[in-house]
Amino acid sequence: MLKPLGDRVVLKIEEKEEKVGGFVIAGNSHAATKTAAVVAVGQGVRTLTGELVAPSVKAGDKVLVESHAGVEVKDGEETYLLVSEANILAIVE
């Protein structure tokens, strides 16, 4: 399992397929944002005074993230997206 460092967050992107004229198009290929599930969260970042600022998201949250943010990583057979917390736009409730 991946354990992110600092303010990084491991996400599992929710893939949606669309069909146009019989062709299957990846659902997120043209969208500005993606919906994802938070899998793991880093401990946060330290301020200049050394205080730890905890992340705003937690494992299990459903979030909206910028579509071109982060780095795709594989852990076994699963593919995840590793992003900075700043690339997460909102928590979906």
From Swiss-Prot:
Disulfide bonding pattern of the chain: none
Designated name of the protein: Co-chaperonin GroES
PANTHER family assigned: 10 KDA HEAT SHOCK PROTEIN (PTHR10772), CO-CHAPERONIN GROES (PTHR10772:SF58)
Compartments in which it is found: Cytoplasm
Protein family (similarity comment): Belongs to the GroES chaperonin family.
GO biological process: chaperone cofactor-dependent protein refolding
Pfam families: Cpn10
InterPro entries reported in the protein's UniProt record: Chaperonin_GroES (IPR020818), Chaperonin_GroES_sf (IPR037124), Chaprnonin_Cpn10_CS (IPR018369), GroES-like_sf (IPR011032)
Signal peptide residues on this chain, from the entry's feature table: none
Any one GO molecular-function label of the UniProt entry: metal ion binding
Main subcellular localisation: cytoplasm
Sorted UniProt keywords: Chaperone, Cytoplasm
Domain of life: Bacteria
Binding partners and assembly: Heptamer of 7 subunits arranged in a ring. Interacts with the chaperonin GroEL.
Function: Together with the chaperonin GroEL, plays an essential role in assisting protein folding. The GroEL-GroES system forms a nano-cage that allows encapsulation of the non-native substrate proteins and provides a physical environment optimized to promote and accelerate protein folding. GroES binds to the apical surface of the GroEL ring, thereby capping the opening of the GroEL channel.
One GO term describing the cellular component: cytoplasm
